[in-house]
Amino acid sequence: MNTSRLFSLLFQGGLVKRIAAGLVLGIVVALISAPLQETIGFNLAEKVGVLGTIFVKALRAVAPILIFFLVMAALANRKIGTKSNMKEIIVLYLLGTFLAAFVAVIAGFAFPTEVVLAAKEDSSSAPQAVGQVLLTLILNVVDDPLNAIFKANFIGVLAWSIGLGLALRHASDATKNVLSDFAEGVSKIVHVIISFAPFGVFGLVAETLSDKGLVALGGYVQLLAVLIGTMLFTAFVVNPILVYWKIRRNPYPLVWTCVRESGVTAFFTRSSAANIPVNIELAKRLNLDEETYSVSIPLGANINMAGAAITITILTLAAVHTLGLEVSFVSALLLSIVAALCACGASGVAGGSLLLIPLACSLFGISDDVAAQMIGVGFIIGILQDSTETALNSSTDVLFTAAVCMEEERKNAA
C-alpha cells in the first residue's frame, strides 16, 4: 500500500481503519524525518506532532465539561427508587485492581528483574506517605467547582456533578431538560473531536518515535517484557474471567471491542482522563444504560487502576531485586495493593503511576534516592509502559461497565 493510499484512508472508512492508517503514517514520518531534515531544513515529525498535541488538548479540555453535565443530567433525570448498578461496577474495579496486583507480584517473583539505575530524577512531586495521598484525595473532592473544571480535577468535578445531580432530582422538568440539552450538546462536540483521532494518532506517533525512538528501550527489554506481558495477561485472561462471571457467555467479543475501540486510542493519548469521551461514545454505541456509564466511566478513570497496580508493583520489585533485598511474597502483595489503591491520587495523568513508586519503595524501606532513580527508569520505558498501562486502565473502565449492564439485562430477561 503506497503512501498516498494511506493518506486517503485518513479521510474515509471506519474510525479504527483510519486510526490504523494514522499509526502507519506516523511511523513512516518518524523514520524519514531525520534523513530529510538536512534537505528541508526542519524536523517533519516535530511539525506534524502539533496535530497530536491539539488532539490531546481538545480531549482533555472537553472531558471536565462532559463529565460535569453528563453526570449531573443523568442523576437529575434519574427516577427516585430506580436501582443503581454502581456497587457492582465499583466491586469489579477494585477486584480487577487487586487481581492485577496479584498477577504482577507473581510475575515479579517468577521473572526477577534487575536494572541499571538511571540518572537521578526530580521526585519532589511524588507523594511521601499514604496519609498525604489520602489528604490530597479529600482536598480534591471538596475543591471549588469552577477551579475543579478549570484545572481538570476530575475527582472534584465528579463530586460536584454527583452532588448537584442528586440535589436537582426534585427540580422542574424544564430544568432537567436544560441539563439534558447541555449534556447532549457537549456529547456532539466530543463526537466531532473523536472523528479527528486518526490525525491525532498520526502526530503523536510521529513525534514520539522521532524524539525518543525505540533504541532507548534496548537496555530494559526484560523489564518491559515482564511489564507488558503482565498487562496483556490481565487484559486477555484475568479480565475475561471477571466478565464471564458477570455475563455468563463468551467474553472475548466484548473484550476485543473494548480493546480495539478504547484501548487503541488510550494507548496513544496516554491519559485515562483524555480517553473518557472515547469511552462514553463507545458505551453509547454499545447501548449501555446512560445513567450508569455516565457515572461509572469517569469514576473508573479515577479508581480503576489495574495498569497502575502492575506498573508500581513490577518497578518496585525490580528495585528490590536490584538492591538484593529479601521481601516475602505476602508482604510484597499487601504493600503493592496499598500503593495501587493510593494511585487514585495520581490517576488521569500521563505517567501518573510513576509518582507512586517512592511511596511503594518507602513501604519496602528503599531510600528516596533509589526510588527517584526508578522513576527515571519509568520515564525511559514510558514510551511503551505508560501507553500500555493507560490502554489497560481505560479499556477496562468501559469493559466492566458493559459487563455489569449486560448482567442486568440478562437478569431482567430471565
Curated annotation (Swiss-Prot):
Gene Ontology cellular-component annotations: plasma membrane
A biological process from GO: threonine transport
Xref: InterPro entries: Na-dicarboxylate_symporter (IPR001991), Na:dicarbo_symporter_sf (IPR036458), Ser_Thr_transp_SstT (IPR023025)
Keyword terms: Amino-acid transport, Cell inner membrane, Cell membrane, Membrane, Symport, Transmembrane, Transmembrane helix, Transport
Localization terms from the record: Cell inner membrane
Signal peptide as annotated in the record: none
Topology of the protein relative to the lipid bilayer: Multi-pass membrane protein
Transmembrane segments: 22-42, 54-74, 89-109, 148-168, 189-209, 223-243, 305-325, 337-357
Function comment: Involved in the import of serine and threonine into the cell, with the concomitant import of sodium (symport system).
Similarity comment: Belongs to the dicarboxylate/amino acid:cation symporter (DAACS) (TC 2.A.23) family.
Protein name from the UniProt record: Serine/threonine transporter SstT
Species the sequence originates in: Haemophilus influenzae (strain ATCC 51907 / DSM 11121 / KW20 / Rd)
